[in-house]
Amino acid sequence: MKFFVGISGYAHKEWKGSFYPEKLPQREMLAYYAKHFSAVEINYTFRQLPSQSVVESWTQQVPASFRFVLKASQVVTHFKRLQNVKKETDDFLRIAAILKKRQGPVLFQLPPNFKKDVSRVAAFLTSIQGRAKAAFEFRHPSWFDDEVVDCLRRHKSALCVADSEDLPATDLVRTANWGYVRLRRERYTDKALRKWISAIRSRRWDEAYVFFKHEDSAAGPKLATRFLELARL
């Protein structure tokens, strides 16, 4: 299994002195980050679509083995809720495709008040088939059933598992040959991290994307580093 491990975002000036060198210019942060981690979850794409030149510059700062995971536009997931979003989705995937082999999955995080609608998700996944690997993070409890799992399996899309203090993780379920896990707590003991590593490996995915939460204290880079250390043991 190949682990792609990182943090939600990288351009955090609060990390200077704890993760980044104190005097590191912001323009050098991505290259420095990519020396330590194999993936990054880009959340600002939720609110704003980056330009072609910005995305091209990202690819020039990281190795070919690095992966960018883009969070889908809020227009698609929150405002229009996967309906009548052909233009917005096409525009988003066109930008994502600039990443080429460095393109990871696209994270579709649905709002907490968006209740189960399998036919809507199925129609949306059909519309993007073959253009992107999709991970879905459902935040209303009505989504967690066999019908939804079967839908994701048919479309070879991942059920994103998110773990936080407010909402502990559901079980890891294999719906594709790759998985997506968001570890959102500020603290994880070695015991907890080992448990996650074991659970992820038991799903026998080809690839596992694992992202830690951004904290001003730079807890995310520390936890991601420790996760990688334990995964190598």
Located regions from the model:
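Residues lining hydrophobic/aromatic ligand-binding pockets adjacent to catalytic sites
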Residues: 1-233
